Amino acid sequence: MTTRKRPLALLILDGWGYRENTQKNAVYHANTPVLDRLNAQYPNSLISGSGLDVGLPDGQMGNSEVGHINIGSGRIVYQELTRIGKAIEDGEFDKNQALVESIDKAIANQGAVHIMGLLSPGGVHSHESHIEAMCRLAVARGAKQVYLHAFLDGRDTPPRSAKGSLAHFDDLFTTLGTGRVASVIGRYYAMDRDNRWDRVSQAYELITEGKSLHQYSNAVEALEAAYARDENDEFVGSSAILDAQGDSAQLADGDALIFMNFRADRARQITRSFVDADFDGFERNVTPKAHFVMLTEYAADIKAAIAYPSTNLVNTLGEALQDSDKTQLRISETEKYAHVTFFFNGGKEEPFKGEDRILIQSPKVATYDLQPEMSSAELTDKLVEAIESTKYDVIICNYPNGDMVGHTGSFDAAVKACEAVDTCIGRVVDALAKVDGECLITADHGNAEQMTDEQTGQAHTAHTSELVPLIYVGRNGSIENDGRLSDLAPTMLTLMGEEVPSEMTGRSIIKLDE
């Protein structure tokens, strides 16, 4: 006989921040009767999901990976942006074994050092200061051929903001006396994470064959031509930057290829195309035997050198639930599935004992403003079914809409996205009430609450540093002020009457009435 559970659900509304300014604030302007009612009826507060409170530099906007690691681990986890920045500052970066060995092997082979990554000051997937340090290191160790393959942002930065970065690196290579920007392509292609291999193949062929839609003599010219085609940074078509002889820089046997993204989810697919022997995402015309380095570990089964291996997080929420013989469900759409599983578990791929997972396919559309509801209805169908089954003690669910639609820059679509999520929350809360369950409703970071950049007038497609909501739909009580994401796991364990592991430095911020 199956024991009936009283589930505690954590609903993470991705990209759903709180902002006083209501101008182009999709969260404010959306018709959200369910959340309005819950805010009026239940304990609620605002908590921090950015900057020092999540292990990022002061003032740095939060992001989904960082948010879920902090939530799931119950502690402030110092992020790779901070960790690698510090290594550069104190000189440790220049001695990093994986980086140094790859450069030295390429030089010994009379080969080239290829550096690829998101060329952006956004700090979400990469930081251009890290890429600059890598270029400087390659030249300092004697590399005569240094090629930068620039993936352009426009999601975590304004849609047309790459010119300054490309111009800076042109100047940098002039100063260094060698090296150049060798190719330019939007992250839409190079950093897909939804198995749209036709996109990734364009970046792969650009780097390995020099195959491109466009050819230019310098990177800024390539960008200006893209803007003339009405392509924002994110969507810049494959552009080879040719040398004085009209040749493109192509990855060859014996070269080094160093991937400077530190965030895993959007780095995995293109990495697999370079390193997996049995890769079948698309037909590869060439497979250069290069020395590939991942800046961080993108997945446990990817066989490549790692410059900065993951720090081991023990006694995360998932592990604590396992040790207490509790059952748990992780559920989301494709776009945020890795966040409620891999990242929430502190970078561990394998499920814990008693942990089930449900993946709902995200819709196959070019950009999510075309379908702002995404797959939220189907996700909620499965979530309600899981709640009604009373199989699970804890359910972790992410609704991606606020973030994924917020990134498109479309205010009207972001409003629709928020409204779709509100409808779904109503169904979930009703289902929980029927089984005497409870839930916490929160967000990992902001996005949809600011859809216009007030300084430039451009669409605001990036995350924000705003506080995020926290609502407790359950017993009578109150929520303490000054909470942060790392307080959620200790709070959940306390609500369940479970012991909080000593490794969790967050605190329980919900006080139940006597």
UniProtKB/Swiss-Prot annotation:
Record: residues binding Mn(2+) 1: 403, 407, 463
Alphabetically, the GO molecular function entries are:
manganese ion binding; phosphoglycerate mutase activity
Residues binding substrate: 125, 155-156, 187, 193, 263-266, 336
Enumerate the Gene Ontology biological process terms: glucose catabolic process; glycolytic process
Identify one Gene Ontology CC term for this UniProt entry.
cytosol
Task: Please name the pathway.
Answer: Carbohydrate degradation; glycolysis; pyruvate from D-glyceraldehyde 3-phosphate: step 3/5
Catalytic residues of the enzyme: 64
Q: Which UniProt keywords apply?
A: Glycolysis, Isomerase, Manganese, Metal-binding
Q: How does it assemble?
A: Monomer.
* Known function: Catalyzes the interconversion of 2-phosphoglycerate and 3-phosphoglycerate.
Recorded protein name is: 2,3-bisphosphoglycerate-independent phosphoglycerate mutase
